Amino acid sequence: MVKLAFGSLGDSFSATSVKAYVAEFIATLLFVFAGVGSAIAYGQLTNGGALDPAGLVAIAIAHALALFVGVSVAANISGGHLNPAVTFGLAVGGHITILTGLFYWIAQLLGASIACLLLKFVTHGKAIPTHGVAGISELEGVVMEIVITFALVYTVYATAADPKKGSLGTIAPIAIGFIVGANILAAGPFSGGSMNPARSFGPAVAAGNFAGNWVYWVGPLIGGGLAGLVYGDVFIGSYQPVADQDYA
């Protein structure tokens, strides 16, 4: 059962919430800068060569490490979402209000966009790689993104949002980084392995190319929402909203 709550302006503009937005902006910027930067660096080292297995592994590791750090540094302030699909999945489960979630989205999208614009500047105008499907249709890309984003948000629920997580919560950032790295290895050659609308939106802004960008909104949001429904209803059970300061 969907547990969406709209929220109030008072809560969404409280000092705690504003700090959370700033934390999401900074952490998303750092994550996207390292993630997209690793792809640009690969292109520089190979003179624009096609992605090979070693390059895929390197980029997956860079994303995993950057997300591990990004979630860690923001976790105590904002919950460490860094991803509109994670925010949406948590909203579906009643862990963040719609209004506060929208401001999370704005912070995440701004952070990702500025990260990519900075990369374009510091690399002397090098092309910013954007996500796009390869060897599959856009519909197949959507399904791929649904599956891998479901895995990501399910992991977030199991290690960070579940009230019974106990000491498991201490490994949440590394578990989240691991699932993202693994999913990039699996989906990178096909859909790009985004799992994150902000991670795809930032490069699209910097490159001025939004072709196929809808895939990386539709797929991740469906996958994240499904994970929120499944874990929230089947495993967490009764609706017990978490206080705003914990996840918002």
UniProtKB/Swiss-Prot annotation:
Keywords: Membrane, Repeat, Transmembrane, Transmembrane helix, Transport, Vacuole. It comes from the Eukaryota. Belongs to the MIP/aquaporin (TC 1.A.8) family. TIP (TC 1.A.8.10) subfamily. It is a multi-pass membrane protein. This is Probable aquaporin TIP2-1. Gene3D superfamilies: Glycerol uptake facilitator protein. PROSITE patterns: MIP. One of its GO terms (biological process) is water transport. The keyword Cell cycle does not apply. The lineage of its organism: Eukaryota, Viridiplantae, Streptophyta, Embryophyta, Tracheophyta.
